């Protein structure tokens, strides 16, 4: 699923080096920043590595950025890979044996590691040792390699898919939450200076409140609205040009786009608001289940338009009102069922 409001990374998101380098520059996630600052200072005061850290939550909220910040704060090298890229245990062994003391190894989509690779990680995380097999058949022997004290940082949008043994080995688990409008305005104002964009306060607010609580989306929208302003001969990005650009991009007043409307209208039109299973929705919309669960549903749930119930997805009365559709008679019964299961 590719669209302007997708929180997933895209090549176009890397236009300028706008990532903050240190905790004091990072906007939002205040509790996480404060706790990380304490943990990092404590580790440095003891001359120890930082405990292995797990960032989880919706995409686009700063998990990779925070991992790089930790690397800068503790003064180690930053090594990055992803779960799908590590196909064999030997691939991970090669990465681990090239680490140095205080290095940060960042594994994105860590929930997609296969079992054989995970088993290599367990002793590496707990004891900083790597057990490898040399040779084949009767001549094969196990060799134990001591690893330097490093920090593993995992990132996942699907915490429930992480195995319990792996999850339990992270000493610092942290959930990243959606941003509010004021926090996104700060992100946009900082970026506007780096992009050399004359962004007014009203323009910043208009973009922020329609960015789905996600910095990555806010920055992407800012770049596109800058394009509309330039072509229209505008020297600044204000509320008027922001609203114009967002309408052209089919982003409505609460940050929904055509994909969200397709999703909501399918449930409303064909299932009277639900409940309906996610597999049915995915098949009907010709989308992957993972794409719906990671890209569309989190924000709809966050703003109260969608509920996940034991019987399936149910859109709320607020969703019907936003769609300007009549509310089916049985809707109140669906929501009562949901509330009873809470």
UniProtKB/Swiss-Prot annotation:
NCBIfam families for this protein: PRK00080.1, ruvB
GO MF terms, alphabetically ordered: ATP binding; ATP hydrolysis activity; four-way junction DNA binding; four-way junction helicase activity
Top-level taxon: Bacteria
Gene name as annotated: ruvB
Family to which the UniProt record says this protein belongs: Belongs to the RuvB family.
Binding site for DNA: 289, 308, 313
Organism of provenance: Rickettsia akari (strain Hartford)
Enzyme nomenclature, EC number: 3.6.4.-
Disulfide linkage: none
Presence of keyword Transferase: no
GO biological process: DNA recombination; DNA repair
InterPro entries (alphabetical): AAA+_ATPase, AAA_lid_4, DNA_helicase_Holl-junc_RuvB, P-loop_NTPase, RuvB-like_N, RuvB_C, WH-like_DNA-bd_sf, WH_DNA-bd_sf
Keyword annotations of the record: ATP-binding, Cytoplasm, DNA damage, DNA recombination, DNA repair, DNA-binding, Hydrolase, Nucleotide-binding
Pfam family of the protein (one): AAA_lid_4
Xref: PANTHER family: HOLLIDAY JUNCTION BRANCH MIGRATION COMPLEX SUBUNIT RUVB, PTHR42848
Protein name from the UniProt record: Holliday junction branch migration complex subunit RuvB
Annotated domain remarks: Has 3 domains, the large (RuvB-L) and small ATPase (RuvB-S) domains and the C-terminal head (RuvB-H) domain. The head domain binds DNA, while the ATPase domains jointly bind ATP, ADP or are empty depending on the state of the subunit in the translocation cycle. During a single DNA translocation step the structure of each domain remains the same, but their relative positions change.
The protein's role, per its UniProt record: The RuvA-RuvB-RuvC complex processes Holliday junction (HJ) DNA during genetic recombination and DNA repair, while the RuvA-RuvB complex plays an important role in the rescue of blocked DNA replication forks via replication fork reversal (RFR). RuvA specifically binds to HJ cruciform DNA, conferring on it an open structure. The RuvB hexamer acts as an ATP-dependent pump, pulling dsDNA into and through the RuvAB complex. RuvB forms 2 homohexamers on either side of HJ DNA bound by 1 or 2 RuvA tetramers; 4 subunits per hexamer contact DNA at a time.
GO cellular component labels: cytoplasm; Holliday junction resolvase complex
Binding sites annotated in the UniProt record for ATP: 18-19, 60, 63-65, 126-128, 169, 179, 216
């Amino acid at each position: 699923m590719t669209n302007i409001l997708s929180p997933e990374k895209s090549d176009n998101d890397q236009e300028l080096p706008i990532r903050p380098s240190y905790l004091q520059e990072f906007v939002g996630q205040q509790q996480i920043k404060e706790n990380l600052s304490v943990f990092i200072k404590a580790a440095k005061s003891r001359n120890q590595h930082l405990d292995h850290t797990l960032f989880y939550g919706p995409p686009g909220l700063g998990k990779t950025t925070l991992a790089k910040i930790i690397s800068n704060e503790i003064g180690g090298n930053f090594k990055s890979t992803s779960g799908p890229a590590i196909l064999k245990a030997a691939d991970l062994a090669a990465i681990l044996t090239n680490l140095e003391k205080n290095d940060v190894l960042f594994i994105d989509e860590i929930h997609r590691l296969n079992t054989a690779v995970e088993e290599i990680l367990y002793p590496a995380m707990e004891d900083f040792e790597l057990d490898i097999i040399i040779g084949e058949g009767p001549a094969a022997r196990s060799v134990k390699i001591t690893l330097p004290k490093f920090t593993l940082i995992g990132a996942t949008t699907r915490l429930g898919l992480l195995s319990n043994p792996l999850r339990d080995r992270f000493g610092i688990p942290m959930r990243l939450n959606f941003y509010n409008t004021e926090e996104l305005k700060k992100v946009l104002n900082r970026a506007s200076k780096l992009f050399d964009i004359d962004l007014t306060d009203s323009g910043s607010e208009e973009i922020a409140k329609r960015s789905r609580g996600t910095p990555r989306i806010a920055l992407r929208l800012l770049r596109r609205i800058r394009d509309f302003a330039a072509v229209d001969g505008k020297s600044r990005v204000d509320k008027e040009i922001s609203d114009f650009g967002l309408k052209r991009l089919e982003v409505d007043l609460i940050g929904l786009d055509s994909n969200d409307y397709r999703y909501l209208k399918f449930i409303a039109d064909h299932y009277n608001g639900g409940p309906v299973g996610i597999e049915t929705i995915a098949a009907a919309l010709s989308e992957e289940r993972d794409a719906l669960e990671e890209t569309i549903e989190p924000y709809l749930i966050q703003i109260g338009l969608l509920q996940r119930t034991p019987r399936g997805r149910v859109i709320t009365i607020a969703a019907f009102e936003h769609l300007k559709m009549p509310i089916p008679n049985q809707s109140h019964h669906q929501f009562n069922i949901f509330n009873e299961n809470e």
